[in-house]
Regions:
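Short, flexible hinge/linker loops that cap or flank conserved catalytic cores
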Residues: 2-4, 130, 173
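Nucleotide donor/acceptor-binding cores
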Residues: 7, 30, 134, 176-179
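Short amphipathic alpha-helical segments
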Residues: 22-24, 46-47, 148-152
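Glycine-rich FAD pyrophosphate-binding loop
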Residues: 26-50
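Glycine-rich active-site loop/strand segments that organize a redox cofactor
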Residues: 46-89
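Glycine-rich dinucleotide-binding loop and its adjacent helix/turn
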Residues: 69-76, 82, 86, 140-179
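Feature captures the FAD/FMN-dependent oxidoreductase FAD-binding
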Residues: 77-142
Length: 179
């Protein structure tokens, strides 16, 4: 027999939408588990760390509105916030509302199928866990999978390659390199 974890709701992704859903689903009394493929919260703001990354939406419009206290304690430093500031904000939200306790980091949902007999979703994760849930929320976002265009010779290129969706957290030194 396979052990199955069971939650009222499962959220896939811990970016801006996923964090919001974890908070709201908890607020209405549901047990929640979120699965995030990355090692931290933030979604696109976790993965896209390239130089100059910033939001094209004004900071006050890019803030959660479910908590007046949160809005009072967080002060954006720029009208159009940078990636590091947005990532700090989302980490602050995750800590402020203790959202991490319901997130399995470094875990993908590999399969989701609806079982009509049980009236539940049955999921398989990349950690070989089986999970059952009544409500399944996909919060993976439009930028969750990187797109690599077909470029002749890319597979034989011996130099370093960087994609904006997966830029190294420690940055890249281009000094004395031909780019």
């Amino acid at each position: 027999m396979i052990d199955t974890d069971e939650f009222d709701a499962v959220v896939i992704g811990a970016g801006i939408a996923g964090l919001y859903m974890i908070h709201r689903l908890r607020e209405i009394g549901l047990s929640v588990r979120a699965y995030e493929k990355g090692d931290g919260v933030g979604g696109t703001w976790y993965w896209n760390r390239y130089p100059g990354a910033r939001c094209d939406v004004q900071s006050w419009d890019y803030s959660y509105t479910f908590s007046e206290e949160l809005n009072q304690e967080w002060n954006w430093t720029e009208r159009y916030p940078t990636q590091p500031e947005i990532e700090r904000y989302l980490n602050h939200v995750a800590d402020r509302f203790d959202l991490r306790r319901d997130i399995d980091f470094g875990t993908r949902v590999d399969q989701a199928r609806f079982d009509e007999d049980q009236n539940k979703w049955i999921l398989r994760t990349s950690r070989d866990a089986t999970v059952a849930t009544r409500y399944l929320v996909s919060a993976v976002g439009a930028l969750s999978e990187r797109f690599v265009p077909k470029i002749n010779g890319i597979e034989t290129f011996a130099g370093e390659q960087y994609h904006t969706n997966g830029w190294p957290a420690e940055g890249v030194d281009f000094e004395n390199k031909r780019v």
